[in-house]
């Protein structure tokens, strides 16, 4: 979900020699005028909502600007709410890979974090205990950095078996209770219950319309956090 930068080069002007110049008088070479120096970018003063996730956040299969974090930003802007949504979704990421890049996320000093990881762990049949431990570590890191964490839960297709699915879903429930987090039990619930046209042909990822629905789901869940932050 880059534009090419354009640089301005100033062409040097040739200095003409004067007809009345003394013989053998050296002619000063033309020097190009210095290129203008761009102003340093100003830091965005808005508080950050970091969406720390996988391909669901990254907008897999969608055009630039169609991911659900993009949709969140549009809704917030339309409501004149001064928040900056930063999309930190990476397609294919597991919770282990999330742990490995946690420092880059906490360095943004987010006020709110939407933690949307674990789905790839489940789809790969990874041990539930390791997924739980990784999510636990990330939650602690974000909370220690001063962020309010919103946990976005996922589920799995029926062929993974009822026991594994139950234990997988329980990860999110248990961690939300342990750390007093806002929990979205199943991030894509509104998509699968409304119309399957909101899911791409792979049966996993949301369409552009589906991403807009997810954006609304997340914004509804974090509304109390947005209001609390505005009162500070």
Locate predicted features.
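Bacterial signal peptide processing site
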Residues: 20-24
């Amino acid at each position: 979900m880059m534009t090419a930068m354009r640089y301005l080069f100033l062409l040097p002007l040739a200095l003409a020699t004067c007809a009345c110049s003394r013989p053998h008088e050296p002619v000063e070479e033309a020097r190009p005028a210095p290129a203008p120096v761009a102003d340093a970018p100003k830091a965005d003063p808005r508080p950050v909502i970091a969406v720390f996730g996988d391909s669901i956040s990254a907008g897999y299969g969608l055009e630039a600007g169609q991911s659900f974090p993009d949709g969140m930003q549009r809704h917030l802007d339309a409501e004149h709410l001064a928040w900056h949504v930063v999309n930190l979704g990476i397609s294919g990421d597991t919770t282990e890979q999330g742990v490995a890049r946690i420092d880059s996320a906490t360095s943004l000093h987010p006020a709110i974090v939407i933690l949307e990881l674990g789905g790839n762990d489940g789809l790969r049949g990874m041990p539930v205990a390791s997924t739980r431990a990784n999510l636990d570590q990330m939650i602690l890191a974000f909370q220690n950095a001063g962020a309010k964490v919103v946990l976005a839960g996922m589920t799995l297709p029926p062929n993974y078996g009822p026991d594994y699915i139950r234990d997988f879903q329980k990860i999110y429930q248990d961690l939300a209770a342990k750390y007093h987090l806002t929990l979205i039990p199943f991030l894509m619930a509104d998509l699968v219950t409304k119309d399957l046209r909101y899911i791409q042909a792979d049966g996993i990822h949301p369409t552009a319309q589906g991403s807009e629905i997810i954006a609304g789901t997340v914004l509804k869940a974090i509304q109390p956090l947005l209001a609390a932050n505005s009162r500070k």
